[in-house]
């Protein structure tokens, strides 16, 4: 199990967004451990690929990796659940981002399109709304797996195999829609793709960079996984 406390201390001195220079003799003041223990634990974090570390004269240069940041995001989500009442919906907010056009291609594939219609009860517009989540919402995104979802099965059309994924029922500014999360994706974790029966950009008069709020429902469609 990674040393969460050391990750938190590194984050507090700025190692999330930049490379910081520290020495074991200085860092132990933040943790209360001896310099020797601090050096050993920092080395272990590097071994677990939670930080990047380079020894330099007078100390070491340290920056947290995406893997390390993800662990802290999960901690944030768990503490949020402990100290706040559970809302009926989970809100994710971010900014509209120009897509790569892949959504239109995949939505039009019959093996997917039929499942969307049968399981989501709407025929999706051939395209997705891509939203880059804010920092807070990016952390909360890990809670998607706790929300009701609809399973979209993978299939083979005789020529190639298409992977499966999950759809999470949402409302985007009052419009019923779904967040699509493929089992395999090359997109970063702070990006979500939304499908809807209408072109959301036109219906909500959205352009690149506009802020949009997505509400994930806690009830509904549980029996359709």
Swiss-Prot record:
Q: What is its EC number?
A: 2.7.1.161
The cofactor(s) it depends on are: Mg(2+)
User: What family is this protein classified in?
Assistant: Belongs to the archaeal riboflavin kinase family.
Q: Which GO terms describe its molecular function?
A: magnesium ion binding; nucleotide binding; riboflavin kinase activity
Which residues are noted in the entry as FMN-binding? Answer: 185, 193
Keyword Iron tagged: no
UniProt-annotated stretches for the region Unknown: 1-89
Q: Which SUPFAM superfamilies match?
A: Riboflavin kinase-like, Winged helix' DNA-binding domain
Spell out the protein name for this chain. Answer: Riboflavin kinase
Q: In the record's cofactor note, how is the cofactor described as bound?
A: Binds 1 Mg(2+) ion per subunit.
In its UniProt entry, the species of origin is given as Methanosarcina mazei (strain ATCC BAA-159 / DSM 3647 / Goe1 / Go1 / JCM 11833 / OCM 88)
């Amino acid at each position: 199990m990674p040393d969460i406390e050391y990750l938190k201390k590194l984050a507090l001195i700025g190692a999330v967004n930049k490379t910081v220079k520290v020495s074991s003799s200085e860092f132990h003041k933040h943790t209360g451990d001896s310099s020797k223990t601090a050096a050993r634990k920092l080395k272990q974090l590097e071994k677990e690929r939670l930080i990047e570390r380079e020894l330099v004269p007078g100390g070491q240069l340290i920056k947290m990796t995406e893997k390390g940041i993800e662990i802290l995001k999960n901690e944030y989500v768990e503490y949020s659940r402990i100290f706040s009442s559970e809302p009926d919906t989970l809100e994710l907010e971010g900014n509209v981002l120009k897509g790569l056009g892949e959504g239109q291609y995949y939505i039009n594939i019959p093996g997917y399109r039929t499942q969307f219609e049968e399981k989501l009860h709407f025929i999706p517009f051939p395209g997705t709304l891509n939203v880059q989540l804010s920092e807070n919402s990016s952390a909360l995104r890990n809670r998607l797996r706790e929300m009701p979802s609809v399973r979209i099965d993978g299939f083979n059309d005789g020529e190639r195999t298409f992977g499966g994924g999950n759809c999470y029922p949402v409302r985007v500014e009052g419009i019923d829609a779904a967040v699509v999360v493929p089992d395999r994706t090359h997109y970063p974790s702070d990006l979500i793709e939304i499908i809807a029966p209408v072109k959301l950009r036109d219906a909500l008069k959205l352009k690149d960079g506009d802020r949009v709020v997505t509400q994930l429902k806690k009830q509904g469609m549980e029996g359709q996984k």
